[in-house]
C-alpha cells in the first residue's frame, strides 16, 4: 500500500502541504489543470527556498490584481466583511470538482465553518470568509485533495503535531496559540505546544487537512521511496517546513485494527440492518453478518466488526445497546496484503483507472475501478461488461509499465 507519512515538527498550513506534494513529485501544472473546473483565475508560484539549511519547495497561490494573504475565517461579528463569502458560495465553487474529490473538499470547508461557528455562537451558514483568504483556502484545499490523488496515495498517516506557542493577533483580538478555531479543529489529534517556538505553526487550513485527509495518527513501519519538504512563510529557530515520507507499508505490518465478533441467536432479523448502519456511523471500517449454527443446531448470526483500536470501546458499547448480545470476542489481526498502485489505461472508450496488486514484486491482480467503468458505461450507453472487456484488452500496456 502506497502511503504518505506527515512529520509536522514545524506545524502545517495549506501552502506547506501543497509545497510538500510538489516536492514529492506532483506536477503543479497538473494541479492547475484539474482545478480549471472551479472557474477561478489563479496561478501557482513554485520556487525552491532554504529554511535553516533545508531546501524545500514553496508554493504560493496568486490571484490577478489581488494581494496574496494567509487564509483565515471571520464571523458576522467582524467589522471587515464587506467582501466576504458565505459557505454556500464556497460549496458551489467546490461542487465543480469531480467525484469523489468534491465531497472531501466540501467536507473540509464545512469543518472550517463549523469550528468558527462554534467559537462565535453562530450557525455555520452565517460564517463569513474573507474574499481573498477564502479563495486562497479554496485552491489550497482543492489542490490538496487533487495532489494526493495525483501522488496515488492510498492512505495518509501523521505523527504528533507541533502547534507552536505564544499568542497570535486575530480579527477579534489577541489569542493564545493555537487560535480558538484551530484548536477546535485539532480535537482528537495528538499535538504538543513547543514552548521554544513562539509562533502559530498550525493554520486553520492546515488543521482541517489533518482532520479530514489523515487516516491514522501513528508512525507506521514503511519502506521509504521519497522524502519531501514543503516550506512555510516564517523564519524560526527551527526549519519552518512540513516533512513528508512517501513510501509503502510492509505487507505484514499490523494495521492497528481490531476485529470484534459476537454470536446472536435471539434478535429480531429486522434490527440487523439498523445495527449495521449504526456501526458504520460510529466509525466501523467493515461490518458483515455470517449465518451460523450454534449449540443444539440453533440458527444464529455472527456479527463481525472491523474498526481501529481507538474505536473499540465505542463500538462495543453500541453493539451491546443495539443488539441482544451480552458478550463479544476481540481479536488483533495481522493483515497481509498485496501492494496496490493506481494506474490509468487508455481504452477505446477513453482513459480508465485500474488498481494493480503486486506481491513479492509480481503482479497478482489488475482490477478496473468500478465507479469509473460504470460512469463510462452510462455516458456511452453501453453494457458495463463491455467497458471491462475494453480495459482488460488494454491491460498488457499497464503490465509493461509497472
From Swiss-Prot:
Q: Which GO terms describe its biological process?
A: protein maturation
This protein's record includes keyword Lyase? yes
Top EC class of this enzyme? lyase
Out of the domains of life, which is the source? Bacteria
Gene Ontology molecular function: lyase activity; nickel cation binding
Q: Pfam families annotated for this entry?
A: Ni_insertion (PF01969)
Keywords associated with the record: Lyase, Nickel
Q: What is its EC number?
A: 4.99.1.12
| InterPro entries xref list | Ni_insertion (IPR002822)
| Coiled-coil spans in chain | none
The reaction(s) this protein catalyses: Ni(II)-pyridinium-3,5-bisthiocarboxylate mononucleotide = pyridinium-3,5-bisthiocarboxylate mononucleotide + Ni(2+)
NCBIfam families noted in UniProt: nickel pincer cofactor biosynthesis protein LarC
Q: What does the similarity note say?
A: Belongs to the LarC family.
* Protein's job: Involved in the biosynthesis of a nickel-pincer cofactor ((SCS)Ni(II) pincer complex). Binds Ni(2+), and functions in nickel delivery to pyridinium-3,5-bisthiocarboxylic acid mononucleotide (P2TMN), to form the mature cofactor. Is thus probably required for the activation of nickel-pincer cofactor-dependent enzymes.
Q: What is this protein called?
A: Pyridinium-3,5-bisthiocarboxylic acid mononucleotide nickel insertion protein
**Organism of this sequence:** Thermotoga maritima (strain ATCC 43589 / DSM 3109 / JCM 10099 / NBRC 100826 / MSB8)
Amino acid at each position: 500500500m502506497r502511503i504518505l507519512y506527515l512529520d509536522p515538527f514545524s506545524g502545517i498550513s495549506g501552502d506547506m502541504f501543497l509545497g510538500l506534494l510538489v516536492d514529492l513529485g506532483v506536477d503543479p501544472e497538473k494541479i492547475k489543470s484539474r482545478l480549471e473546473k472551479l472557474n477561478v483565475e489563479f496561478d501557482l508560484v513554485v520556487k525552491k527556498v532554504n529554511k535553516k539549511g533545508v531546501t524545500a519547495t514553496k508554493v504560493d497561490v496568486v490571484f490577478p490584481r489581488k494581494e496574496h494573504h494567509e487564509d483565515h475565517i471571520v464571523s458576522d461579528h467582524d467589522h471587515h466583511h464587506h467582501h466576504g463569502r458565505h459557505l454556500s458560495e464556497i460549496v458551489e465553487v467546490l461542487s465543480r470538482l469531480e467525484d469523489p474529490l468534491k465531497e472531501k473538499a466540501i467536507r473540509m470547508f464545512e469543518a472550517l465553518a463549523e469550528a468558527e461557528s462554534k467559537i462565535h455562537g453562530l450557525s455555520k451558514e452565517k460564517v463569513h470568509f474573507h474574499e481573498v483568504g477564502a479563495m486562497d483556502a479554496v485552491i489550497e484545499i482543492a489542490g490538496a485533495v487533487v495532489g494526493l490523488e495525483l501522488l496515488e496515495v492510498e492512505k495518509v498517516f501523521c505523527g504528533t503535531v507541533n502547534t507552536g506557542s505564544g499568542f497570535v493577533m486575530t480579527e477579534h483580538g489577541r489569542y493564545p496559540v493555537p487560535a480558538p478555531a484551530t484548536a477546535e479543529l485539532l480535537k482528537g489529534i495528538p499535538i504538543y505546544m513547543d514552548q521554544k517556538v513562539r509562533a502559530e505553526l498550525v493554520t486553520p487550513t492546515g488543521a482541517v487537512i489533518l482532520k479530514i485527509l489523515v487516516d491514522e495518527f501513528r508512525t507506521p513501519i514503511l519502506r521509504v521511496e521519497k522524502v519531501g519538504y514543503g516550506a512555510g512563510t516564517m523564519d524560526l529557530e527551527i526549519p519552518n517546513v512540513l516533512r513528508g515520507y512517501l513510501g509503502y507499508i510492509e505487507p505484514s505490518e499490523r494495521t492497528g485494527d481490531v476485529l470484534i465478533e459476537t454470536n446472536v441467536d435471539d434478535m429480531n432479523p429486522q434490527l440487523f440492518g439498523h445495527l449495521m448502519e449504526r456501526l458504520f456511523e460510529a466509525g466501523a471500517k467493515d461490518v458483515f453478518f455470517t449465518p451460523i449454527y450454534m449449540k443444539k443446531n440453533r440458527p444464529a448470526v455472527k456479527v463481525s466488526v472491523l474498526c481501529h483500536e481507538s474505536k473499540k470501546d465505542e463500538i462495543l458499547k453500541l453493539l451491546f445497546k443495539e443488539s441482544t448480545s451480552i458478550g463479544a470476542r476481540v481479536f488483533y489481526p495481522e493483515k497481509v496484503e498485496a501492494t496496490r498502485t493506481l494506474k490509468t489505461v487508455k481504452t477505446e472508450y477513453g482513459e480508465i483507472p485500474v488498481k494493480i496488486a503486486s506481491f513479492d514484486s509480481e503482479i497478482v491482480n489488475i482490477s478496473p475501478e468500478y465507479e469509473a467503468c460504470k460512469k463510462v458505461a452510462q455516458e456511452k450507453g453501453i453494457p458495463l461488461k463491455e467497458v471491462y472487456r475494453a480495459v482488460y484488452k488494454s491491460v498488457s500496456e499497464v503490465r509493461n509499465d509497472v
